[in-house]
Amino acid sequence: MLKKLILGFIILLFCACNDEKIDENILSKGTKTTEQYKQDINNLDLNSYKEIAEFFKDNQNIVFSDKPVLIIFSANNCVYCDKLKHEIQNNKEVQNILKNTYNSYYINTSYHKIHNYDNKKTSTEELSREFNIDATPTLIFFTPKHKTLLIYPGFMSAKRLALTMEILKDEKNQKLNEDELFKTLFLAYKEKNV
């Protein structure tokens, strides 16, 4: 028993005399996370639309103010979402309308995020359920007062998108009932051949 005690003391002495310092970088700091880390996690979805992100507002805070609102729902590995991004990326008119005329938001449903929407915190999944997002892309157009004007599932060309945004920003068109609005859009699409 005495031998074990002496051996333990010798081992403890050698360990205490060791000059190596513990590398604090390999130790966990517990649940403390930096603000940069939190921001990076919240912006993971930005990489999925980085080529057009400058035309959209931060989707964590969806604001209804004096401008109409457009929310585009997309997903990873969605061919038509990529095609829509390409259309936006290559059309200055659409870029200008998205940035200056609308409060525009791009939400990738492949990522979990919390959004401030309708004065409450709502997850991406809850928003998708609220608007019955079954297919991507889906474009949802709102009045500044939060009335849903149009839910458009599927791809929309840049020319049709620009025309749709121009028609839906007009207050007189925002007051039309659903049938009248669809008729107005259909006739405009036909006239402009988009």
Where are these regions (language model features)?
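Sec-dependent N-terminal signal peptides
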Residues: L5-F14
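A short beta-strand-turn-helix
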Residues: Y49-V69
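Solvent-exposed loop/turn segments at secondary-structure junctions
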Residues: A75-Y80, I88, S110-I114, H146-K147
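Non-globular targeting/processing and membrane-anchoring segments
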Residues: C17-A53, I151, A162-V194
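Short active-site neighborhood of thiol/selenol oxidoreductases, capturing the structured segment around
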Residues: F64-D82, S104
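Typically the conserved alpha-helix immediately C-terminal to a functionally engaged Cys/Sec
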Residues: D82-K99
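Thiol-based oxidoreductase modules, predominantly thioredoxin-like and allied folds used
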Residues: V94-T122
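Non-catalytic, surface beta->alpha helical segment in thiol-disulfide oxidoreductase systems
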Residues: E87, R129-K175
